[in-house]
Amino acid sequence: MLEEGIGILSQDVGYVFQNPFNQNSGIKVTVYEEVAYGLENLGVSRSEIFERVDAVIRLLNIEHLADKHPMKLSGGQCQRVALASVIVMEPEVLIIDEPTSQLDPKGTEDVFKIIDTMKKKGKTTILVEHKIDRIAEYADRVILMDAGSIALDAPVAEALSDKRLMDYGVTLPQCALLGLALREKGFDLNRIPITIPQAKESVAALMEKGGTGNAHS
């Protein structure tokens, strides 16, 4: 990737700013035009622009914003538009910086589902995020940065059940804390759960063993 020119990288890598207002072009008068702006710069045909923009605004559920002025949106609305303006470019790699910082819980869930959809389409997504329970549910791998260096790089289940994360001020998922506490009490867990469904499975497995698992005296 380092050998690629900036022009090529700009087509292969999409970046969503933490502050969505910084991503607004400032020259378009409707959300629809704002989302289409990048495609226009690449010389994409008019028919393809309409097709791709229509698909993306449906995906992000922002049809009702299509005719609004980009500078008159709320923070959450602007965040969705910023995400749409990048996804419409169909980059191979998405870098998304705190995409839910201005969203309510419902909006947060919607955005993570969109990110999951991109992942299922084969898009590499690098997500900068502090909502640990969302990371547990949607991420494949976790990289912990400390003072500009990589402090930990591991699959999500391994990373989010590692107590060393707390040394860096990272709170483990509640489900992981439960699993670690049970294991410390001597319960034989086949894995440390990091999500609610996993925790339910672990507790159900213990119940099948009589409620005590293989706890040691």
Model-identified regions with their sequence ranges:
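Conserved catalytic motifs of ABC-family nucleotide-binding domains
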Residues: 90
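H-loop/switch region of ABC-family ATPase nucleotide-binding domains
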Residues: 129-130
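Conserved ABC ATPase "signature" region
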Residues: 36, 40, 47-64
